[in-house]
């Protein structure tokens, strides 16, 4: 038996789910913060973007943040210095999911999902997460900045 995620379209066995995959990623990242955790800022944003976990404004802001990480090579510490701390998981003092969601979400076709992330070793993992982030940017190029 297989099932398709209603949000990102990932095809997974019936006893697996995107949430379960995400929990596995988080466990690896927290156990190995310097290796697997090197892409933590991307993993969380990618998962939330693909599962429509943010309100519209935060969704667009999070995608812009991913673009700065991936295309401009901005590091998470630098991003925090720029005052984008409301997307930093340590500073969630206001709701990031409250309010109108991205109306265009259902029209996005995702070319990669969390089901494509291999957990074999840190090199493969970080590579796959980075590819995932890049695919999210190109899959949503038509949306407003
Ligand atoms: Zn999913």
What are these regions (language model features)?
Residues 1-145:
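Intrinsically disordered, low-complexity linkers and terminal regions
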């Amino acid at each position: 038996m297989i099932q398709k995620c209603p949000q990102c379209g990932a095809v997974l066995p019936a006893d697996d789910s995107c949430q379960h995959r995400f929990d596995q990623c988080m466990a690896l990242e927290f156990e190995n913060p310097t290796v697997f955790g090197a892409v933590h800022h991307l993993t969380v944003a990618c998962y939330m973007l693909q599962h429509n976990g943010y309100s519209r404004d935060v969704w667009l802001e999070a995608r812009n943040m991913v673009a700065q990480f991936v295309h401009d090579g901005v590091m998470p510490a630098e991003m925090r210095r720029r005052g984008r701390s409301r997307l930093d998981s340590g500073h969630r003092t206001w709701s990031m999911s409250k309010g109108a969601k991205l109306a265009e979400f259902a029209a996005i076709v995702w070319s990669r999902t969390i089901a494509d992330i291999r957990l074999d070793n840190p090199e493969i993992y970080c590579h796959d997460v980075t590819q995932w982030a890049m695919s999210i940017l190109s899959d949503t190029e038509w949306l407003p900045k």
